[in-house]
């Protein structure tokens, strides 16, 4: 909104109004605003949650310090959502299709997570919303995002087209054209590109339509997987928020580079017109998650709940899809991936051993993985992996996961220069 106001003032030669033309200025402003909003309103929202007795119900799983968390206000993801929406609405171009998609994603998954937390807190149902309804909500968002990227004329990439002139001396010229494409970015392949159309060569005359169908299905899968991965990661104070902030920095850098022809050419990635506005959103996202850590770091004064975790995961997924970096998610979101896989392996192995031996056995002392480090080894738990034998303090687990997240974020960007 402020962009349009200051654009009008700039036409009237108002001093300083032209600063709002620059994405860097608006991104910096969005970062500062989101930090201020999340810290300023955070305390008030926490007090309100306490007054309404919206506290976390904790099952005794035998984890160190676990029961002390009982009654800590939950649904704090509201703080993150507000701190993202307000700066984005104020600083970004609201007619940008990518910004619109990110705003829809934030509200959509925020509402889904809020409904889940509401059932847990007010209906006294620890399981919350039935899993199938969560999946329907996530799939619905993925379908909307995929179809918009397919149908909107504003969603294009720019590619160099080679034009040859057969004169006495062969002349080759390149010019840039906007095109709809099912290409995405992946390292180690030629030009760092992969086209989903290559998966449907059998489709003949319907190859283009089949490629977009594969792309939409991929969008649905990524949104569902990453939002659930973030949800799994939200088990220790500051873990999900800090990890998401790190991922947000990497995505912001990738969006900036994808929106500038020189940087895109340097990294050999797709040039995406309009993606520069996503840098403003990324700045608000980073500020909101870092500001939330003010209250969520150990010992947490508030938990984000599914209101926050589902939203953070969905935002990361849709953002990566928009800038065509979804195939980098296994590296960038490696923490989410490992947390998710640890649960799937634990459940699958438990069921297999129960069927084969009559009793369920474990791979980890406890899943998701971060809880494995909170359990002592050789404490009567039949698990394939017993190390570490000593309990690792919660704050140390979180910081170590953050450090791994930073390494993965750097690796994600560096891999784009590998040939």
Swiss-Prot record:
Main localization category: membrane
Keywords, comma-separated and alphabetical: Cell cycle, Cell division, Cell inner membrane, Cell membrane, Cell shape, Cell wall biogenesis/degradation, Magnesium, Membrane, Metal-binding, Peptidoglycan synthesis, Transferase, Transmembrane, Transmembrane helix
Entry GO terms, CC: plasma membrane
Keyword Transmembrane: yes
Catalytic activity of the protein: UDP-N-acetyl-alpha-D-muramoyl-L-alanyl-gamma-D-glutamyl-meso-2,6-diaminopimeloyl-D-alanyl-D-alanine + di-trans,octa-cis-undecaprenyl phosphate = di-trans,octa-cis-undecaprenyl diphospho-N-acetyl-alpha-D-muramoyl-L-alanyl-D-glutamyl-meso-2,6-diaminopimeloyl-D-alanyl-D-alanine + UMP
Segments traversing the membrane: 22-42, 72-92, 94-114, 135-155, 210-230, 238-258, 266-286, 303-323, 327-347, 396-416
EC number: 2.7.8.13
Compartment(s): Cell inner membrane
Superkingdom: Bacteria
InterPro entries noted in UniProt: Glycosyl_transferase_4, PNAcMuramoyl-5peptid_Trfase, PNAcMuramoyl-5peptid_Trfase_CS
Signal peptide: none
GO molecular function: metal ion binding; phospho-N-acetylmuramoyl-pentapeptide-transferase activity; UDP-N-acetylmuramoyl-L-alanyl-D-glutamyl-meso-2,6-diaminopimelyl-D-alanyl-D-alanine:undecaprenyl-phosphate transferase activity
Cofactors, names only: Mg(2+)
GO BP annotation list: cell division; cell wall organization; peptidoglycan biosynthetic process; regulation of cell shape
Family: Belongs to the glycosyltransferase 4 family. MraY subfamily.
Function of the molecule: Catalyzes the initial step of the lipid cycle reactions in the biosynthesis of the cell wall peptidoglycan: transfers peptidoglycan precursor phospho-MurNAc-pentapeptide from UDP-MurNAc-pentapeptide onto the lipid carrier undecaprenyl phosphate, yielding undecaprenyl-pyrophosphoryl-MurNAc-pentapeptide, known as lipid I.
UniProt cross-references to NCBIfam families, sorted A to Z: mraY (TIGR00445)
This protein's name: Phospho-N-acetylmuramoyl-pentapeptide-transferase
Gene that specifies this protein: mraY
């Amino acid at each position: 909104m402020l962009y349009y106001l200051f654009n009008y003032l700039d036409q009237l030669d108002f001093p300083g109004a032209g600063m709002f033309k620059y994405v860097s200025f608006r991104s910096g402003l969005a970062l500062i605003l989101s930090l201020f909003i999340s810290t300023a309103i955070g305390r008030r929202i926490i007090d309100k949650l306490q007054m309404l007795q919206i506290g976390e119900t904790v099952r005794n799983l035998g984890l160190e310090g676990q029961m002390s968390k009982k009654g800590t206000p939950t649904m704090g993801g509201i703080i993150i959502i507000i701190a993202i929406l307000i700066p984005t609405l104020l600083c970004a171009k609201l007619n940008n299709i990518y910004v619109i998609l990110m705003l829809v994603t934030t509200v959509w998954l925020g509402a889904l997570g809020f409904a889940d937390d509401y059932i847990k807190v007010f209906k006294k149902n620890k399981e919350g919303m039935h899993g199938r309804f969560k999946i329907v909500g996530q799939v619905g968002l993925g379908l909307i995002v995929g179809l918009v990227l397919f149908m909107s004329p504003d969603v294009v990439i720019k590619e160099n087209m080679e034009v040859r002139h057969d004169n006495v001396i062969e002349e080759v010229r390149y010019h840039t054209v906007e095109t709809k494409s099912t290409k995405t970015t992946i390292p180690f392949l030629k030009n760092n590109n992969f086209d989903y159309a290559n998966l449907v060569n059998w489709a003949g005359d319907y190859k283009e339509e089949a490629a977009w169908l594969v792309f939409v299905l991929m969008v649905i899968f990524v949104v569902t997987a990453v939002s659930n991965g973030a949800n799994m990661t939200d088990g220790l104070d500051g873990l999900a928020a800090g990890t998401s902030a790190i991922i947000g920095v990497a995505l912001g850098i990738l969006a900036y580079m994808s929106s500038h022809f020189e940087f895109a050419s340097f990294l050999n990635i797709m040039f995406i017109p309009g993606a520069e506005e996503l840098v403003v959103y990324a700045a608000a996202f980073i500020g909101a998650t870092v500001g939330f850590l003010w209250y969520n770091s150990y010992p947490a004064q508030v938990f984000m709940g599914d209101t926050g975790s589902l939203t953070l995961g969905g935002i990361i997924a849709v953002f990566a899809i928009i800038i065509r970096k979804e195939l980098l998610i296994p590296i960038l979101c490696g923490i989410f991936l490992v947390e998710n896989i640890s649960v799937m392996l634990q459940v699958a192995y438990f069921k297999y051993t129960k069927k084969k031996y009559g009793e369920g056995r474990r791979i980890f002392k406890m899943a998701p993985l971060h809880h494995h480090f909170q359990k002592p080894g050789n404490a009567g738990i039949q698990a394939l992996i017993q190390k570490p034998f000593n309990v690792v303090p919660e704050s140390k687990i979180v910081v170590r996961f953050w450090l791994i997240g930073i390494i993965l974020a750097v690796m994600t960007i560096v891999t784009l220069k590998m040939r």
